[in-house]
Amino acid sequence: QYDGVKAPDPGPGPMGMMGARGPPGPPGPPGAQGHTGHPGEPGEPGQTGPLGPRGPPGPPGKSGEDGNNGRPGKPGDRGAPGPQGARGFPGTPGLPGMKGHRGYTGLDGRKGEPGGAGAKGEPGAHGAAGSPGLAGSRGRAGPAGPAGARGADGNAGPAGPAGPLGAAGPPGFPGGPGPKGELGPAGATGPSGAQGSRGEPGPNGAVGPVGPPGNPGNNGLNGAKGAAGTPGVAGAPGFPGPRGGPGPQGPQGAAGQRGLAGDPGTQGVKGDGGPKGEPGNSGPQGPPGPQGEEGKRGPTGELGATGPAGNRGARPGSRGMPGSEGRTGPLGMPGARGASGAAGPRGPPGDAGRAGESGPAGLRGLPGSPGSSGPPGKEGAAGPAGQDGRGGPPGPTGPRGQPGNLGFPGPKGPSGEAGKPGDKGATGPTGLRGAPGPDGNNGATGATGPAGGPGEKGEQGASGAPGFQGLPGPAGGAGEAGKPGDRGLPGDQGVSGPAGAKGERGNPGAAGASGPQGPLGPRGPAGAPGTDGGKGEPGAAGAAGGPGHQGPGGMPGERGAAGPPGGKGEKGEGGHRGPDGNAGRDGSRGMPGPAGPPGPTGANGDKGESGAFGPAGPAGVRGASGERGEVGPAGAPGFAGPPGADGQTGARGERGPSGGKGESGPSGPAGPAGQSGPPGASGPAGPTGARGDNGPPGLTGFPGAAGRVGAAGPAGLVGPPGAAGPAGKDGPRGLRGDPGPSGPSGDQGMVGPPGPSGEKGXPGTPGTSGPLGLQGFVGLPGARGDRGSPGGAGAVGEAGRVGPAGPAGARGAPGNLGLPGMTGPQGEAGREGNPGNDGPPGRPGAPGFKGDRAGPTGAAGRPGNRGESGPGGAAGAVGPAGARGAAGPSGPRGEKGVAGEKGERGMKGLRGHAGLQGMPGPSGPSGDTGSAGPNGPAGPRGPAGPHGPPGKDGRAGGHGTLGSPGARLPGPPGPAGGGYDVSGYDEYRAAKDYEVDATIKSLNTQLENLLTPEGSRKNPARLSHPEWSSGFYVFCDFNTRETCLHAHPGSLARAEGNSRFTFSVLEDGCTRLPLLDLAPLDLGGADQEFGLDLGPVCFK
């Protein structure tokens, strides 16, 4: 029936489905005429116009400012040699030329007259080393070289025997949570145990399942009301009963207090666009708006048509650039050679040179025949080191050894003092040309040269294959708010309106970029020579030229003043060997030399059977020194040492003879590009090319060699988008562009990060009341928590898929000059020069490579005297693995290993002893009145009551569930019932006093807790400060936020012990147990047992 009460408003309904897209509206009315546009971008350079007629030669112009160096012209044909002119004044030094080709050998000139003594010239470059002198006497032993670089790790030796079991380490920190293991299979049923002794009577069993309803009995007589019994001891709380069915719907509750604002929801997915609305009526024309900001630069205009040929020039052009320098004239006739000057007086002896580097290693001897392997000896203790013996006399110089490998770089030596300048020796005869030495090692890295000029633009490389997509980077932090975004995609194209009135003519655009260079016109007549321009900047230093031919000797200058002391001279060549001296007296016995390097490993003998380990013998006597082993192979070349410090400037050497003038060098590199010429006349517009397919973006190629400057290439394909640059400053606002055609709708973007929490919303309408829930347990009141701070921004969603490449954009304005390109690859070798004169003898070449064939074995030499101890040899090759050593001491305890895989299910543990009875729990809240229980046993028959009217037989009700026991307070005394005889019912009377029993049990439990504390708040297992009585103090680790309850080391729980460790907390604030790690240590013995019973607790 209708009760007249208004139903609560459920609020607005859900959003409907999105409608289909409507048809396009009719075209709008034409807009008002726009303002005159800003001048457009400069147009593309027009095509080259036809060649104009040749103008008359102009008068000579004023001398212009110094122009940039022009490109060198092509070399002209070689002219006939002119007569030798008079000697001119010395000109200003010219720019250094490129390295010329080697000239032909000139004829010997006439001998010149001896000149006066010239000034002493600067010291010349170091001359080539002369031929090797005779071997000098053996120098003093140099200091031991630095330790070599660490050798490569040897092969792993065989595994050693297992060490003794180490002592148990301290427990490690809890590890991270392992993955949840799979449920193990059910274990097999264990064997039956032996019959235990009879246990104490157990507590009452749980209520059995409800039996089927009995047949309805006859209605019994109403019994008299019994006397109130004594309140029973509160039973232990029962297990939670099964979940009851839903109760009837309760009355509507009163509106609750307004809750705190919830956390902000995640940002919803962007809804689909609604249907397009119908077009509105045309509004009246508004007043003209203010002048808009300057629009973005429009696209470059199309190429203009070819303009008409220009008029013939009215006045002659300005003076042309000076021509390139003429070719060098032919070489003059060489002069006659001057006489040698007189030898100077002998200078004082120079300082003693540094000790020479160690000589190369001697030849490796032939390997001896392998000896048979002896039985393995016992390892003796090392004997004490003997004293060093005195060095014996030096032996005769051995033959020159084969070249060793490049040694490790030595430490940087101190700068030597400057030596006194030596006298100039007589010029020796020119030696034969030495054979070319092998390639030298790479020199140390030179200082960074000056930055090269900008390279010419290389030709466009082919598109490379597309690169792989990179892995997603880590989520970046929230960026600052960006500047206003770029202009959005153009909207749908409107229907064209009628053409507006013609606008005013725009300002002329800026001059277009210069067109390609026109064909070369006919050569004009030469202008009058201009005045000399100012001296140009000195050019960059050219590469050093090759050595020229030896010119005739100059006139000797006057003797110069003494130069500063020169750098310390190189070690002189050894003198001739002197005659053998008289034999010296025998010296006293020298100290033993240091141990020689290890000898070569002998061939492996037959493997003997392994004998049993014998006892360690006493230390043996030190054996006699073995013969010096062969020098091991040199180690691998070391890394290049650091460049040494600059030495002091040497004295200026004498000026060397002038070289012959070389032939003119190849054309120099192209000079910097000149300034743009005037724009050429526009050429005819070419046909529009077909649109090419977009190529895939290529991988970055290696930088190519600098190509010649090509003609301007066509507009390149759009490259892949570059990395986002920093936000630019806001440009001036452009005029509004025409609406473009509608772009395809993009894919739906990923859900953005949740925004910051919004403002507090208005209270919502009260919802309909839900059905009344089941009554929960009475929880303890929680403390009111602080309001949480808004969560941080979520991680940035993955980037959307890359859209298709757009059409090729208009050609952009020319960019700024790029950074100088990388140094190009080395050019091809020049033409081979003509053979030069025989040069002076070269320095001794680097050691040659090892020959293929071994030479014949020489005759055995006399045994030499014992040499001095040589420097320590290079590290020998890795020897074979040594004999197995004795077991080492136990290593330190390793770090905690990774959690192992889940083990198999263990055997069923022994049954634990019965636990102690718990303390009586606090009184629970009053339970709901239970439904009527089953009929109890018939009570004693009461006196007959008055007869009531007979009722109808009812059906027996179903069995109700037992209610939880409430704390029953005694009611007021009822009226006295009728008396009856209780004899014969003594067996039904309680034989115990329950209150006394409960007190005794409580005391017993407290005594047990004193003896075996279980770790609760009232019975803590161990207090770190027992004198503090205001709380429960445990050992905590605040770094890992752990609560550590350490066991007392003396009371480890055994399987037969009674160990029940529980830990009660004051407040139950969670429903799950976040155990991060559980690592029982020292388990697995036959008498050890481990169990864990976790209740609903929460700690961190």
UniProtKB/Swiss-Prot annotation:
The protein, known as: Collagen alpha-2(I) chain
Subcellular location: Secreted, Extracellular space, Extracellular matrix
GO-annotated molecular function: extracellular matrix structural constituent
InterPro entries: Collagen, Collagen_Structural_Proteins, Fib_collagen_C
Domain Fibrillar collagen NC1: 1071-1100
Main localization of the protein described in the UniProt heading: secreted
Biased composition (Low complexity): 122-170, 200-209, 216-237, 251-261, 333-352, 358-385, 435-448, 460-472, 507-517, 633-646, 666-691, 702-729, 757-775, 798-820, 854-866, 877-892, 916-935
Location of region: Disordered: 1-982
Comp. bias regions, Basic and acidic residues: 568-579, 893-907
